[in-house]
Amino acid sequence: MARVMALKTIMESKRSREPAVRTIYKICPAPAWREAERAGVYRGSPDDARDGFIHFSTAAQLPGTLAKHYAGQSGLFLIAVNADALGAELKWEPSRGGDLFPHLYGELDPAAAETVTTLVLKADGRHLLPENLT
């Protein structure tokens, strides 16, 4: 019984470190996403392959992710995915500044996308994010 209680405490502690955020976002070049839709699977970018997981961001993390990795790039999609639909393959892990970032250790089924939005590139090289991000 003590072992079961200890395991329950560990699991509750782990869940409490996961953000309450339920929608996460993948930034993806439009041609790569269209190919994933045709193939029925998205395996990630070259950076994702190098790191061993597909990088996602929360709405709050998107401006930093775009500035650091995608400044000045046009032709990008913002793919919204329900984090709960990804199951145990989704891990929340510390990254820049200790923030927890969502990482998918597996392939993404394009059918899991709730929305796919074209990111508008402004004249200053920054992207215009949709107003309704959660």
Where are these regions (language model features)?
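N-terminal amphipathic/basic-hydrophobic helices that include classical n-h-c signal peptides
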Residues: M1-P19
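Conserved, structured core segments of small domains
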Residues: K14-T134
